[in-house]
Amino acid sequence: RSTESYKNLIVSENNELKVIKPFGPTIARVKMPNELIKNLNDYVDEILSDEDKSKKLDHGSKLAGSVTQEFKLEKEFIDSSGYKSFLSKSVIEWLKISGYGKVDEFKIISSWIVRQFKNEYNPIHWHGGHVSGVGYLKVPDSFGETPQPLTNKSNKNGNLELVYGSRQFLSDSSFSIKPETGYFYFFPHYMMHAVYPFTGTDEERRSISFNALIDEKSFYVYGN
């Protein structure tokens, strides 16, 4: 499946947040406020202009990707920019709509920026913590063409691919997301995912990711 069919997969809606259930676990899709997108991009550009700070915050050695640059966000910025509040409110609403009741705690473990350019990729992997997600701060106007003409398959250049379980009768095992500037996707930490390379442009695909903990009462709802 792909984001083109997400409207058919919505479990419930509340304003801009949509809870999507393409397979076992639910995921959530929410539009970031424009002010937050600007704050995050301004912060990234500020870090990029400071070589010493870029080196200090470098996170590339800790992550799976073959990409140009990955660096951590500073806690002070996470707390003061509205980003932490956005994540907390979105996760709480997602889990409530998904039937998991009230979440009493939300603690960010880490958050980082990924700067990806043509021919770069992120291999299949998963995260730590309890909940994770990715949002898009900049995307190219085009992700390039495929070498062979496509028939009934969509162009997945630059896509985020979520993977869960195995493909069986009446059971899809993957969900492909075409990045759009300003949209954030939330998923459980164990959700395997990969990012495909793109071609045909020198523009940046800039994303932001996080790992967080919620209270154990909510996370271990089915026991430890």
Predicted regions and their residues:
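A short beta-turn/loop motif at secondary-structure boundaries
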Residues: 103-105, 200-202
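Non-heme Fe(II)/2-oxoglutarate
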Residues: 3-101, 112, 119-122
